[in-house]
């Protein structure tokens, strides 16, 4: 079953065949369209983006924010990228190492305790595991 799901998602992503009302996407591999497809083109959703890099190009949350009125918090360790992010985007960009973030505290600072989409794009597996260990998914 897992291989069937992986195969389906790979094919959908390759062709970007998700049912969405938009013709343009910004993600490198259609992640933004995938989220919209899974969540039935949800408007006014919320995201937590860990590893945001560029605020628009190849960004997995820009479409959600700009066309579907999503709010969220984007975190990146690179302060230069976050400076650019905060000039280009209306949602919060935070310069911090995601593996050191207290996520409960961060979300409460932005009055956003519900996350529809958790986006993780951190460069190495060990850091990704560290981040996942720091998130209480039961809350």
Where on the chain are the PLM-derived regions?
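A generic structural signal for secondary-structure junctions
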Residues: 40, 90, 108, 133-136
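Conserved acidic-Pro-Pro-aromatic motif
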Residues: 46, 62-63, 67-71, 110-139
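Extended hydrophobic/Leu-rich segments
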Residues: 1, 5, 9, 98, ...
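SAM cofactor-binding core of SAM-dependent methyltransferases
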Residues: 22-104, 124
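Membrane-proximal basic amphipathic "stem/tether" segments
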Residues: 1-23
């Amino acid at each position: 079953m897992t291989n069937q799901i992986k195969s389906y998602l790979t094919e959908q992503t390759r062709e970007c065949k998700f049912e969405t009302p938009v013709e343009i996407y910004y993600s490198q591999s259609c992640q933004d369209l995938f989220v919209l497809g899974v969540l039935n083109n949800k408007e006014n959703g919320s995201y937590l983006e860990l590893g945001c890099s560029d605020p628009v190009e190849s960004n997995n949350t820009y479409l959600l924010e700009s066309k579907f009125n999503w709010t969220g918090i984007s975190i990146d360790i690179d302060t230069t990228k976050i400076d650019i992010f905060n000039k280009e985007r209306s949602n919060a960009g935070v310069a911090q190492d995601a593996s050191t973030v207290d996520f409960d505290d961060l979300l409460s600072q932005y009055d956003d305790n519900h996350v529809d989409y958790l986006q993780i794009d951190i460069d190495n597996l060990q850091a990704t595991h560290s981040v996942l260990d720091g998130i209480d998914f039961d809350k």
